[in-house]
């Protein structure tokens, strides 16, 4: 019997401009690639192309990935959506999987209505907690709510995200499916200097790296031989560098900029503790990656992380609380030996390719039956 065909409409997806953009969506698709025939279509706006619309095809482990690059402008957006519609019709899917609500869920809903094809939605967007949802226009909100009600299932990465969506009036059949953590490990030694690490977007309103620098400043008064590695880029990078300079931390703090997944894993493996000081996270894959590298985590109670972090994996603190963060960092230095690397690694088996793939496959079977 031939395999069922699943079409993935991805609002975020790795591309030539941003190779790590929505990589967690790509990993979700990879986790189920053996069960069905898959095709991915995503759209990316950029002015780096010569023509108004450019179609680029890539094959990853027998999955066809199509990225439509288009220049800014309403007419170009309409044209590219029309091409996505035609490509969808040619593929003749048995099921559509929309990743991150927006044009993806709207097109999935319309195709479902006209071609009697079921669809499900996976949501990762943190905008339901922030101002993002409130700033959507009336039509966008209505389309999201209709698509959500008509979808066979909405898969969210945490109960925290589900609760935020319900508060915004997005009613649906919900299920919780976390992100994939590959379980990569590197057999390399730790830094000789006790090392804290942060990896993520350098945006103050979400990640609060300012609080990390201020807490680190307090800790270094008591422990001189420590360091802090900051991986990532964003609009507040200069502000953070200026603050590091102002606090005279430059001999202890290193800014690494945007780096590859491999670089992040290597740095995590060499470090002692990951710090997540976010105001909100729908899941926080970096926490799971740290555990897979055998290092404990200091994290704020910011939504997603506390669904799988506990006293055995590190220390949970209140949001926007520098005193608690300072104390947690001091405790990690003094009590570090209590965290067993192999036990930390075992905590992320629930997010393995096989485990997440099985959960997604169950949703496919329900939708198709």
Functional labels for PLM-detected ranges:
Residues 296-299:
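Short hydrophobic beta-strand element within catalytic cores of glycosyltransferases
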Residues 24, 42, 144-186:
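Donor nucleotide-sugar binding/catalytic pocket of nucleotide-sugar-dependent glycosyltransferases
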């Amino acid at each position: 019997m031939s395999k069922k065909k699943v079409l993935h409409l991805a609002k975020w997806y790795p591309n030539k401009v941003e190779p790590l953009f929505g990589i967690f969506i790509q990993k979700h698709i990879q986790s189920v690639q053996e069960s069905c025939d898959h095709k991915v279509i995503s759209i990316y706006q950029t002015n780096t192309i010569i023509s108004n619309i450019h179609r680029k095809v890539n094959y990853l482990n027998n999955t066809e990935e199509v990225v439509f690059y288009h220049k800014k402008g309403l007419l170009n957006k309409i044209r590219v959506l029309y091409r996505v519609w035609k490509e969808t019709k040619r593929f003749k899917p048995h099921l559509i999987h929309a990743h991150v609500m927006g044009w993806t869920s709207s097109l999935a809903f319309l195709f479902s209505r006209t071609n009697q094809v079921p669809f499900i939605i996976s949501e990762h967007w943190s905008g339901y907690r922030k101002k993002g949802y409130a700033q959507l226009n009336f039509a966008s909100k209505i389309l999201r709510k209709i698509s959500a009600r008509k979808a066979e299932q909405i898969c969210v990465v945490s109960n925290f995200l589900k609760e935020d969506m319900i508060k915004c009036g997005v009613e649906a059949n919900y299920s919780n499916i976390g992100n994939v953590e590959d379980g990569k490990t590197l057999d390399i030694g730790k830094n000789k200097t006790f090392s804290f690490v942060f990896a993520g977007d350098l945006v103050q309103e979400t990640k609060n790296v300012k609080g990390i620098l201020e807490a680190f400043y307090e800790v270094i008064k008591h422990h001189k031989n420590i360091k802090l590695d900051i991986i990532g880029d964003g609009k507040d990078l200069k502000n953070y560098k200026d603050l590091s300079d102002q606090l005279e931390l430059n001999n202890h703090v290193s800014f690494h900029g945007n780096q590859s997944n491999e670089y992040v894993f290597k740095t995590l493996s060499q470090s002692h503790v990951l710090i997540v000081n976010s105001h909100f996270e729908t899941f926080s894959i970096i926490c799971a990656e740290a555990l897979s590298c055998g290092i404990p985590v200091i994290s704020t109670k910011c939504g997603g992380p506390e669904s799988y972090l506990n006293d055995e994996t590190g220390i949970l603190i209140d949001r926007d609380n520098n005193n608690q963060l300072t104390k947690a960092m001091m405790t990690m230095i003094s009590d570090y030996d209590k965290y067993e690397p192999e036990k930390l690694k075992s905590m992320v088996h629930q997010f393995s390719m096989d485990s997440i793939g099985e959960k997604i496959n169950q949703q496919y079977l329900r939708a198709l039956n």
